[in-house]
Amino acid sequence: MRPDMIVLHYTGMPDATGALDLLCTPGSEVSAHYLVFEDGYIVQMVEESRRAWHAGTSFWAGETDINSCSIGIEIANSGHGYGDPDFPKRQIAAVTALCRSILTRHTVPPERVLAHSDIAPARKQDPGEKFPWRTLSDSGVGHWVKPAPITEGGALLTFGHRGDTVAAMQGELSKYGYCIAVSGTYDSATQAVVTAFQRHFRPERIDGIGDESTRATLRELLAQSGRVRTIAARAHNLERLATS
């Protein structure tokens, strides 16, 4: 396996020890490469070269077998079902250091450091809106832009809306990598994807509504992603010229 994706999860269980037991029980049919405890202690359960069962039914940028191309990191946090606690700073420092270490061994583009909810928006919420994606990005892990400010007024795309503006947003979400049909109808699947996007990139308000803040943040992510790919391509071409 040559992973080109990192997927971050929360355990969603009352305590880390119980999560570790579950992840190490063959009959549970769930596993991950790493588990990061609240105090920053890291346990590796599966070698990075081997496939772990952490993604489930999922999709990103045309890929449906996420388990075969990703490294899964479980973060000990009881999640939405148990009070939605904050992530301790030392735990986030450990997650960041682990991801940076993985990036030295594998080529993982920033936009392929993802939440479980990004790749399975209809099923999953983790690691949730309290996960500090900006902190990771500031350390060179993942993709982040400053969210566009939330303002009252403007066009709001909500369940049942139809039209070109809906189709345009669906197309942009699909281009970024999400599993979404460009139908022009704001259906429940679109609502789930928008909610997942907000959890990751616009966590100030999670409502599944395609407001101007959400759409502007998405457009800036796409623009920045395009610039990063252009710079990477130029660097690759220069490297080829230098060695030819």
Explain the meaning of each model-derived region:
Residues 78, 119-120:
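Short acidic/polar capping segments at secondary-structure boundaries
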Residues 56-59, 88-114, 120-244:
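Cell-envelope/ECM-targeting effectors and their regulatory/trafficking segments
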Residues 4-111:
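Active-site-adjacent loop/helix surface patches within enzyme catalytic domains
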